[in-house]
């Protein structure tokens, strides 16, 4: 099937069910890899080193927000066929944005050093994350087409390989006392491999083009969609960046360590469902009864898993920290874990509803 060809409702439903199963499996694999690595790194790294790790990724995520004006989401959400002109316009605009942002990131290096007290090693890690942002933007179109067509069997492979390479290299090099440089090496290698693998799985010939009309049509949905996500970026990564300058890397290490564990139920239960339901809901826009049923089922499924998982996590966190000697240093983060847990419960209800409104084009409501 051509990348721009529309698919029927029956195909959408079948691929959506398979997609949820595939992405749930992907999430399970990724979280197992991430958990194993995070557990090992929690014992090997100091809170300050962990803080540098989180702050660097927060900087990268903040820049990544401005590298996207919602064009990929607009391609997924669009009713009807997607044209090659729209694909190439999206590709061209995004590459231009990323190059400008990378230049700003380099210019802002003295600010990162003074505000966070970063060493040269930490700065090199941030630059490596900037390079990974470029590699990620280069694979946006084939990834978007796989997602639009609900071909999640292919879609998940580069993500799993990326995570496996990154965490394996990170843990190995940290164990060998490479410190923060471990992450610099790991992120470059993993992002390059995932870029090449994406184009192997979904060949698409990159090209430079610009259509004002195509860009305008996509921005009608994409820009409000991206503005809508700014609250999430400001709440998570923005807050990390502000608090990092006030509390220092060690203080932010405690807070974000707690948040990562508290958000774990969302990553397992909610993320795979939302990833599939966004394009699926978009394809169901003309069938209200099917759409309503799908929304209700997705919320019920997510809440039935997230609610008990969060409560259980808060209860057992203290005893686990007491049991593992190398984790005693994370005891100050237990209060933050409980507080963030309540936010996780609310997100299990509100995020699927926001996803539904976005998928059906009611972006101004959200």
Describe each model-derived feature in a short phrase:
Residues 66-83, 147-148, 258, 262-306, ...:
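Helix-loop junctions and terminal segments of transmembrane helices
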Residues 13, 17, 80-83, 134-159, ...:
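Membrane-interface junctions at transmembrane-helix termini in multi-pass inner-membrane proteins
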Residues 47-67, 132, 239-241, 253-270, ...:
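Alpha-helical transmembrane segments of polytopic membrane transporters and translocases
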Residues 12-69, 97-98, 102-110, 128, ...:
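Signature of the first transmembrane helix
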Residues 111-129, 313-345:
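Interfacial segments at transmembrane-helix termini and the short loops linking adjacent helices
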Residues 1-12, 16, 153, 196-237, ...:
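Interhelical loop/hinge segments that connect adjacent transmembrane helices in multipass membrane
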Residues 35-49, 113-116, 172-174, 233-264, ...:
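Helix-terminus/linker motif at the lipid-water interface of multi-pass membrane proteins
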Residues 123-130, 157-204, 217-221, 228, ...:
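Hydrophobic alpha-helical transmembrane segments
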